[in-house]
Amino acid sequence: MFYTETYDVIVIGGGHAGTEAALAPARMGFKTLLLTHNVDTLGQMSCNPAIGGIGKGHLVKEVDAMGGLMAHAADKAGIQFRTLNSSKGPAVRATRAQADRVLYRQAVRTALENQPNLDIFQQEATDILIEQDRVTGVSTKMGLIFRAKSVVLTAGTFLAGKIHIGLENYEGGRAGDPASVNLSHRLRDLGLRVNRLKTGTPPRIDARTINFDILAKQHGDEVLPVFSFMGSVDDHPQQIPCYITHTNEQTHEVIRNNLDRSPMYTGVIEGIGPRYCPSIEDKVMRFSDRNSHQIYLEPEGLTSNEVYPNGISTSLPFDVQMGIVNSMKGLENARIVKPGYAIEYDYFDPRDLKPTLETKSISGLFFAGQINGTTGYEEAAAQGLLAGINAGLYVQEKDAWYPRRDQSYTGVLVDDLCTLGTKEPYRVFTSRAEYRLLLREDNADIRLTPIAHELGLIDEARWARFNQKMENIEQERQRLRSIWLHPRSEYLEEANKVLGSPLVREASGEDLLRRPEMTYDILTSLTPYKPAMEDKEAVEQVEIAIKYQGYIEHQQEEIEKQKRHENTAIPANFDYNKVSGLSNEVRAKLEQHRPVSIGQASRISGITPAAISIILVNLKKQGMLKRGE
């Protein structure tokens, strides 16, 4: 049975990737359908109730800079905000919000239901319809067929998902939700390379059974950060603290004594788990020299009694989980509300994707989120946004768009996945980016909002606000450049009181601000440089641009060198077997990866500079040497 309407884009899945993937083409004007097995779990935070963190906060800001939802929802739901690495340089500072699960889900659903060009339908997708290697639509469990020109699959952990608690296991996409078994079988039939990964979650604890009085309290920042460039502190709900406890030798003994009942340590689980979010049993065994691990007790919401014990993800049996929880300070009488578990699921080799997240073998089919081997809400959202954009562009047969590594953390994420692939759940870190001084949270809008405007992703209100900010930055920099202070100035004594060393030669406001002891606030407290600008975002950009000017210019020079051939395109039909001078190993790797550019080829393990030179020579000989944008 065919559904009465035809869509431009269909998105399967209503998680963090799916919601961004559906909103993006709808904002661009494409008729979009979001297909989900349960409309009540749209935007569900399946694991930890938090958004952001090191590297992850950068992704949230980038999604927001292009009109995405995650930052807005985090502002509406954040019950504790912190800036991580606040004492370090601006490149690695990151925003993190503890979120109320219910408020977050409400914010997501409200945005989806009020988005023009977007329909939502509750039904499990069981098949992707393909004709002549081109996607044509989706069929559902009840036999309903939806026609579309492009499809974005964001299945999360649902593809052949299997939940493990102790040595017991059962099919499931997450606790309380069924797995997508039929869809998994269909995708395997398409010949895409598939493997298994696993992730886990800790037991949830009843807050009424925790003795908070004897635990260390962790408050959020006094000056509350805001995630969205369009947001304000007024968006935030009531702020509440988290608490800290620790595992101890008794905890570790409980774990060691029950490893024979662990699905991980008995070989029942075959999928590889996230390296940077290990289970508590993994931590105890891998770091056997440590007799304690810090555990954060994070509230799940303002109206919920559930507490998320961040740091004790486990798949051990329920009685062992009780032993672990009750062995810790403040949790001696704690009661578990929901058991922890591990989940195994299918993921597909991201090297089979273009950097647009379209599959190489099936035109119009895009993958985003955990199906590509990533872990984390933020990584999923960034991929969803990118896949949604390109699903829309594909419909109009327009040139695809994807960010470069020097342009965004999303670009780093996608390039890593599509070039190198992954054998374990991939998460973003600032250390993965070569040009992280340029890829800061604070300048995500400067990097990406003009592109978003060109693509039709943002409204005129956001565009006007962005342009006003850019104008404020330029005007203030020009003002500081034009005001000079000289050694005979009547304001010299006032200035010398705040300068580390007396002024001996004429200096502009920019020159003074470059001094390590000087800040914008101090500078604009001096009579010649009053008044301070009120636009705090613009102030931040002015101060960073001036103080880090030398470092920024150096990185930009490095980027220009790299870009010389970074975007030189390699045609899809380029035959490496006809290129003389390449070793069999290099030829095989290039055929396997099918890089789309010289830059991507150069990052494949084992591809030497000599091999890159040979390819460039052959591209030139064959008249194929074209520079990308």
UniProtKB/Swiss-Prot annotation:
What are the required cofactors?
A: FAD
Q: Where in the cell is it found?
A: Cytoplasm
The alphabetized list of GO BP terms reads:
tRNA methylation; tRNA wobble uridine modification
What the record says about family reads: Belongs to the MnmG family.
| Positions contributing to FAD binding | 13-18
Q: Which GO terms describe its cellular component?
A: cytosol
Chief location of this protein? cytoplasm
Keyword Lyase, does the record have it?
A: no
Q: Name one GO molecular function term.
A: flavin adenine dinucleotide binding
Q: Which domain of life is it from?
A: Bacteria
Keywords of the record, alphabetical order, are: Cytoplasm, FAD, Flavoprotein, NAD, tRNA processing
Per the entry, what this protein does is:
NAD-binding protein involved in the addition of a carboxymethylaminomethyl (cmnm) group at the wobble position (U34) of certain tRNAs, forming tRNA-cmnm(5)s(2)U34.
Q: Could you tell me what this protein is called?
A: tRNA uridine 5-carboxymethylaminomethyl modification enzyme MnmG
Residues annotated for NAD(+) binding in this entry: 273-287
Disulphide-bonded residues: none
